[in-house]
């Protein structure tokens, strides 16, 4: 499924705007949630540095990870008409 995240573009980093070395990032991680991220369109495109390099890459930076999870949760609630409780039923946690 295509992403439902507003402002995401497969050709540039969602966080910094770089246009080289772009990678797909599943907003909600873990085996089950990764598949759910794909199912519900909760992915963004990040450059390699914002995705997977310390200290600011989302896989190393809790603040950035939480920010993307909040954006993802809000997008899912808007797109699918979910309440916070309904989102929590699917992804196991509220990030707002």
Can you describe what each PLM-predicted range is?
Residues 1-12, 35-41:
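Short, charged surface segments at domain edges that flank catalytic/cofactor-binding sites
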Residues 21-35:
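Short recognition patches in nucleic-acid-associated and regulatory proteins
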Residues 70-96:
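Short flanking/linker segments adjacent to small metal-binding domains or redox-active Cys/His motifs
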Residues 20-23, 42-46, 72:
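Amphipathic alpha-helical interface surfaces
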Residues 18-23, 52-55:
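Short functional micro-motifs and their immediate structural scaffolds
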Residues 13-16, 47:
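Short cysteine-rich clusters marking metal-coordination/redox-active sites
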Residues 43-68:
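Short Cys/His-centered divalent metal-binding micro-motifs
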């Amino acid at each position: 499924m295509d992403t439902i995240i507003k402002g995401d573009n497969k050709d540039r980093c969602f966080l910094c705007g770089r246009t080289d070395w772009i990678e797909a990032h599943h907003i909600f991680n873990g085996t089950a949630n990764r598949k759910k991220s794909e199912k519900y369109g909760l992915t963004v495109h990040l450059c390699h540095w914002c995705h997977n390099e310390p200290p600011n890459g989302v896989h190393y930076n809790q603040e950035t990870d939480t920010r993307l999870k909040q954006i993802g949760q809000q997008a899912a609630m808007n797109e699918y008409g979910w309440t916070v409780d309904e989102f929590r039923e699917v992804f196991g946690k509220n990030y707002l």
